[in-house]
Amino acid sequence: MYLLILFLPLLGSLISGFGGRWLGCRGTNTFSTLCVVVSSLFSLLAFFEIGLTNTTCTIFLVSWIKSGAFYVSWGFLFDSLTVTMLVVITLVSSLVHIYSIKYMENDPHQPRFMSYLEIFTFFMLILVTADNLIQMFLGWEGVGLASYLLINFWYTRLAANQSAIKALIVNRVGDFGLSLGIFLIFWVFNSVDYSVIFSLVPLFDNQFLTFLGFKLHVLTLISLFLFIGAIGKSAQLGLHTWLPDAMEGPTPVSALIHAATMVTAGVFLMIRFSPLLEFSPTILFILITFGSLTAFFAAVTGVFQHDLKRVIAYSTCSQLGYMIFSCGMSCYDVSLFHLANHAFFKALLFLSAGSVIHAVSNEQDMRRMGSLLKFMPLTYSVMLIGTLALIGFPFLTGFYSKDFILELTQISSYSNLQMSYISFACWLGTMSVFFTSFYSFRLIYLTFLNNTNLAKSSLNLVHESSLLMIFPLIILSIGSIFAGYLIRDLFVGSGSDFWGAAIFILPKHSTFIEAEELPIVVKWLPFILSLLGIFFASFVQIFLKTFYFKSNLQNLLSFFTFLINKKWYWDVLYNRLIVLPILNFGYSISFKILDRGFIELSGPYGFTKFVSFWSQILIKLQTGQITHYLFFMIFTFCSFSIILVYSYINLTFNLLLLFFTLFFFI
């Protein structure tokens, strides 16, 4: 059963990809969706069998690499962390497959699309079930490759080409850091197996290595390289630029990437390596810093976006910041709890956005929408549920995890850390709630409630989506309402031993009990900020809309708006400092020198010219006259004689010098 969870999506991908021409769109859709649905059912069974009984299952398939101490096998680890991720991945993937049947029905390459979706799911399953770093890295790279194929699915579009290449290259930076971490882990622990690494970590707590004169803590350096990998995959500040541009792919791709796969890989990596991170306070501080900055930066940027999918994309970036933030506070279980909850309402938001885009003839600019409530009441209802869950409205899924993270941040700033920069990071995360609420309800107003800016011909074509697109939305909306309440006590309840040995937290880093001692105002603060964001968004959209465009307020904010719409100049910075110098170097060196004959001149062409040149000179010595040959012989003999005599004289002089030196000193 456990292996079927993994290999059913692979089977569906191979059949859809190679047999789609014979099966047709309907046959491909049915078979591929059935494979993922069955895999999700088996994942639920595995969750009940392993998660609820707090057991671990390890499956060994075959030895893979044997080279001295380097030993890698094909094996799979199923523990509470793994089965939770399996349920999230396969459930969301199943609903995305069902949704895609209708969404992509007019695309002639639908079998290829289904094949890409399933191979994406398969590589993510390999990533979370691996019991060693090499196998995990295979899944890690496979997810990156599949994301490139899906973002570039409409490969005739230039924007899709650019976005896919950008995602691939930016993630290569993080992958390079992860590969360095794997090399260093093998050098230190002499193994890449999880069980060996985690059992030996305490023994290396006081180990240091010297590099370029700097004394570095081994565990901190390893954790830093692993976190660089997480920065790339989970789109943290600095390597986040690929995530908004990934919206060029079909909307189901965006839902799968942002809800259950790809971006969650970095968070999963941090949670899986909690036994290592716990022994590195420096890395925990870095996680808190990056998480809070990412959450705040993405929330502020989302306020000024006009593309429907980009607004939701920046909300993903912000929520990933909360997850990394939580890992930095050693609350790995809360981070995974939020990851699971986030999968429901984020998939719901993206698929609802796809339903809207599908209805308005592929228009994505929210300013051109409006008045869609009376045409699409069901889509409006489920999107409102997803929005409320995103902002952490009480008793919805996001409330139980997001507010818990914010409470724990306040514990960190109030009690055990007592550092000004940690407090600042905590308040950044808290203030992000206001901006999240603002842009979320701005999206609702611009898309559904404001007066429409659509052409009458387009407005007449607006309609509610079909049952195959509505069914996943209903399932996800139910999950967005009840999932957080149902699994809260199991995942993060006081005294719950659900995670067992899958997550390790040092006793001094545990802060759950202190959450009960927070002032009531601090506990209510996220909800108050959410209400303020809703009120401010409503006030601006209803009352200040005309005033804003007729007053000088726009001029006052124009620079700030321009700065954010330029993505804070991250792309410009990378282009000026990295991309353009490399291109100029390539043009001046590679193109103008190497590609114009230097390699040929110093290679086979140059060697043949060299031989030909000297052969022509030597040919001229063959005159056929014996006097010339005698001259060359005498000249050669005299030359060698002079060299030998000079060498003998030099040797004799050195021996005499050595003799007199020893004589006088002795």
From Swiss-Prot:
Pfam annotation, one family: Proton_antipo_M
Listed EC numbers: 7.1.1.2
Gene Ontology annotations for the cellular component aspect, listed alphabetically: mitochondrial inner membrane
Keyword Transmembrane assigned: yes
Keyword field: Electron transport, Membrane, Mitochondrion, Mitochondrion inner membrane, NAD, Respiratory chain, Translocase, Transmembrane, Transmembrane helix, Transport, Ubiquinone
Top-level class of the enzyme under EC nomenclature: translocase
Localization in the cell: Mitochondrion inner membrane
Family annotation (InterPro entries): NADH_DH_su5_C, NADHpl_OxRdtase_5_subgr, ND/Mrp_TM, NU5C-like, Proton_antipo_N
Catalytic activity: a ubiquinone + NADH + 5 H(+)(in) = a ubiquinol + NAD(+) + 4 H(+)(out)
Role: Core subunit of the mitochondrial membrane respiratory chain NADH dehydrogenase (Complex I) that is believed to belong to the minimal assembly required for catalysis. Complex I functions in the transfer of electrons from NADH to the respiratory chain. The immediate electron acceptor for the enzyme is believed to be ubiquinone.
Protein family membership: Belongs to the complex I subunit 5 family.
Protein name stated in the entry: NADH-ubiquinone oxidoreductase chain 5
Gene name, Swiss-Prot/TrEMBL: ND5
